[in-house]
Curated annotation (Swiss-Prot):
Component of the large ribosomal subunit (LSU). Mature yeast ribosomes consist of a small (40S) and a large (60S) subunit. The 40S small subunit contains 1 molecule of ribosomal RNA (18S rRNA) and at least 33 different proteins. The large 60S subunit contains 3 rRNA molecules (25S, 5.8S and 5S rRNA) and at least 46 different proteins. There are 2 genes for eL32 in S.pombe. Keywords: Cytoplasm, Nucleus, Phosphoprotein, Ribonucleoprotein, Ribosomal protein. It is found in: Cytoplasm; Nucleus. GO terms for molecular function: structural constituent of ribosome. This is Large ribosomal subunit protein eL32A. CDD domains: Ribosomal_L32_L32e.
Amino acid sequence: MAAVNIIKKRTKPFKRHQSDRFKRVGESWRKPRGIDSCVRRRFRGTISMPKIGYGNNKKTRYCMPNGLKAFLVRNVSDVELLLMHNKTYAAEIAGNVSARKRVEIVEKARALGVKVTNAGAKVRSQE
C-alpha cells in the first residue's frame, strides 16, 4: 500500500464574522445565527464557515510533517509506552518538565529508538 501524502485542506483559521471591525467581538469562531446574516446565507465574497468538507484524511489527521503523531511525555515511564509504537508516534516532552528529567527522558528514548521532537529544549550543554 502506498503512503498517503499529508494534505491539509485549510490551514487558515476560521475567524468570527466582523471580528476585524469591533474590538468587543473576539476572533474565536461563532456560528452566525442572525436572520439577515450574509455569512450564514453564504453570500459570495463573505468569509467561509467551517464545514465537514474541510476535514483531513483520517490516516493523516494529527500527523506532523515527518508523518508521526505527537505524544506528550511527562516522565520516563511515559516513554516506555511508545516502545511498540515508535513508527507511529513521536515523543514530545511537556513544558513543565525540568532540565534534569529532560536529559533522562531523551536518553531513555534514544535507547528505545523513539524520536523526540523537542529533545534540545531547555537542555544546556555542559561547559
